[in-house]
UniProtKB/Swiss-Prot annotation:
Specifically dimethylates two adjacent adenosines (A1518 and A1519) in the loop of a conserved hairpin near the 3'-end of 16S rRNA in the 30S particle. May play a critical role in biogenesis of 30S subunits. It comes from the Bacteria. NCBIfam families: ksgA (TIGR00755). S-adenosyl-L-methionine binds at residues 18, 20, 45, 66, 91, 118. One of its GO terms (cellular component) is cytosol. Its main location: cytoplasm. Belongs to the class I-like SAM-binding methyltransferase superfamily. rRNA adenine N(6)-methyltransferase family. RsmA subfamily. GO terms for molecular function: 16S rRNA (adenine(1518)-N(6)/adenine(1519)-N(6))-dimethyltransferase activity; RNA binding. SUPFAM superfamilies: S-adenosyl-L-methionine-dependent methyltransferases (SSF53335). The keyword NADP does not apply. SMART domains: rADc. This is Ribosomal RNA small subunit methyltransferase A. Its EC number is 2.1.1.182. It comes from Pasteurella multocida (strain Pm70).
Length: 288
């Protein structure tokens, strides 16, 4: 028996496909999303429809973004949902969700998008950060991710899980774990445990920075040398006196600072940039 085949479709490794089939888990996720009839829901990576079907039954319309041509075609001809599904066959990493928001006239309707999905684990982090660019257009997001990634997203200061990913995610969103999911809930079963997370974009950013490049840069430099004191880890960006003036304990390490601390450092760097600035780095690359 082919462990990679489910409902007549063979999982494709290049798309990171693991199909959810546990009904208890599916019910738990749909309950967490709590879709309402007239809301604008967008599913990323619907796959074989494990979440698409129960969510689609509860709403007037559902938009799905699917890269796999065969799966997109199956959804277009779904036996009872085809009339209420819009299938966008494209790479979600390249898709303009802001244009989708505008095309649906959601601002006029005083609505925002609700996004959910069982994300391919190999692109989950950059995909989330692509979506954060559209945080003003999104009401909330529910994603299936690796359990370790969810721990990092939800972590607080002074913990091993706390890192650059934590700070950048919580800068944009309130982050809450929803439920844990064992490998047996998927076909083929992944080699890691999974979990569902809820991300709710802040209506007003609690710690706004003037330039996201500098928030990413200072977090990257601090956490890439997380065993060093900040005095040493950030020595190419700040002098010891400057850190002290900014209220930073010179003996602290990267995991000891709050998001507010990092935002303060980033805003200082925006106003006082070092001479050797290279802004070609991308915010999406956030593996600690």
């Amino acid at each position: 028996m082919n462990s990679k085949k489910h409902l007549g479709h063979t999982a494709r490794k290049r798309f990171g496909q693991n199909f959810l089939h546990d009904n208890n888990v599916i019910h738990g996720i749909v309950s967490a999303i709590y879709p309402q009839k007239d809301q604008f829901l967008v599913e990323i990576g619907p796959g074989l429809g494990a979440l698409t079907e129960p969510v689609g039954e509860l709403v007037d319309h559902l938009t799905v973004v699917e890269l796999d041509r065969d799966l997109a075609e199956r959804l277009r001809h779904h036996p009872f949902l085809h009339h209420k599904i819009t299938v966008i066959e494209t790479d979600a990493m390249q898709f303009d969700f802001g244009q989708l928001y505008r095309d649906a006239n959601l601002a006029e309707k005083k609505q925002k998008m609700r996004v959910f999905g069982n994300l391919p684990y190999n692109i989950s982090t950059p995909l989330m950060f692509h979506l954060f660019k559209y945080h003003d257009c999104i009401q909330d997001m529910h994603f299936m991710l690796q359990k370790e990634v969810v721990k990092r997203l939800c972590a607080g200061p002074n913990s091993k899980a706390y890192g650059r990913l934590t700070i950048m995610a919580q800068y944009f969103c309130q982050v809450m774990p929803v439920l844990e999911v064992p490998p047996t809930a998927f076909k083929p079963a992944p080699k890691v445990d999974s979990a569902v997370v809820r991300l709710v974009p802040h209506k007003v950013l609690p710690h706004p920075v003037k330039d996201l490049y500098w928030l990413n840069r200072v977090c990257s430099q601090a956490f890439n040398q997380r065993r060093k004191t900040l005095r040493n880890a950030l020595s190419t960006l700040f002098s010891a006196d400057q850190l002290t003036e900014l209220g930073i304990d010179l003996t602290a390490r990267a995991e000891n600072l709050s998001i507010a601390d990092y935002a303060r450092l980033a805003n200082w760097l925006t106003d006082n940039p070092p001479a050797d600035v290279n802004k070609d780095e991308m915010i999406e690359h956030l593996d600690d």
